[in-house]
Amino acid sequence: MSNIVQKNDPVLRGKAKIVPIKEIGAMKTRELIEKMKIAMHSQKDGVAIAAPQIGESLQIFAIAGSLLKKAVKNYKGDENDLIFINPRIIKTSKDKKEMEEGCLSVRWLYGKVNRSTRVTLEAYNEKGKKIVRGASGLLAQIFQHECDHLNGVLFTDKANEVWEMTAE
């Protein structure tokens, strides 16, 4: 599965390390981001991926831009993948909603997780620029799911109900 680690790998349970600011634009970081994108796009249902999912304990996640273009109402960005380095959710709505989730590292299990309907995320992009981004709906759900990965939490830890589906 294109080097995507699975739920029993200890890297998924640790708190990922912060990427030093001076290393954000470094070749090593750029190569890691490229590996993440390749792994994410190797799966038809790949929506987003965090560095620990490819065995690297660093606070980075990527979201498939092509998915956002299709799935997020009024999405104004292009189809480039979005990169978030050292992300922190700085604000969450009190409104919560139970949402279905799956994960490339917990293959073929799905569940319902109670998530905030709106969040604000602070992070650095791959060029080292600090960004603050508000999100609702699917994008807010992805931000929360990926930040959980960076803190050693899998969606199955929070799910109210979990079921298995087969690859189709």
Model-derived regions, located:
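Active-site rim/adjacent substrate-binding subdomains
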Residues: 1-144, 149-168
